[in-house]
Amino acid sequence: MGNCNKPPKRPPNTQTSAAQPSAEFRRTALPSLYGRYNCKCCWFADTNLITCNDHYLCLRCHQTMLRNSELCHICWKPLPTSITVPVEPSAPPP
């Protein structure tokens, strides 16, 4: 009775949700036969790159794209939302 401001109860989602896309963060991109890698969006950044499907994005462009949508503006696939940072040695082995 009366006005109720509670949101309607929804049944639990029985579908399996797709895994969140994951990306690897690299301070410097792997060496290439065709020269250095750059961010495919701004073409300026060549360090601190994130792998997106078949290209690299810098952190700045990645965050800008995530603010606008969940899809990459270049390849139209889901943007990585979790970033894994590999352990890089700080010095060469003895």
From Swiss-Prot:
The gene is Z. Its main location: virion. GO terms for biological process: viral budding from plasma membrane; viral budding via host ESCRT complex. Myristoylation is required for the role of RING finger protein Z in assembly and budding. Signal peptide: none annotated. A lipid is attached at G2 (N-myristoyl glycine). A zinc finger (RING-type) spans 39-75. This is RING finger protein Z. Residues 1-22 are annotated as: Disordered. GO terms for molecular function: RNA binding; zinc ion binding. Keywords: Host cell membrane, Host cytoplasm, Host membrane, Host-virus interaction, Lipoprotein, Membrane, Metal-binding, Myristate, Viral budding, Viral budding via the host ESCRT complexes, Viral release from host cell, Virion, Zinc, Zinc-finger. Plays a crucial role in virion assembly and budding. Expressed late in the virus life cycle, it acts as an inhibitor of viral transcription and RNA synthesis by interacting with the viral polymerase L. Presumably recruits the NP encapsidated genome to cellular membranes at budding sites via direct interaction with NP. Plays critical roles in the final steps of viral release by interacting with host TSG101, a member of the vacuolar protein-sorting pathway and using other cellular host proteins involved in vesicle formation pathway. Interacts with protein NP; this interaction probably directs the encapsidated genome to budding sites. Interacts (via RING domain) with polymerase L; this interaction inhibits viral transcription and replication, Z partially blocks the product exit tunnel for the releasing nascent RNA product. Interacts with the glycoprotein complex; this interaction plays a role in virion budding. Interacts with host eIF4E; this interaction results in eIF4E reduced affinity for its substrate, the 5'-m7 G cap structure. It is found in: Virion; Host cytoplasm, Host perinuclear region; Host cell membrane. A motif (PTAP/PSAP motif) lies at residues 89-92. Late-budding domains (L domains) are short sequence motifs essential for viral particle budding. They recruit proteins of the host ESCRT machinery (Endosomal Sorting Complex Required for Transport) or ESCRT-associated proteins. It comes from Machupo virus.
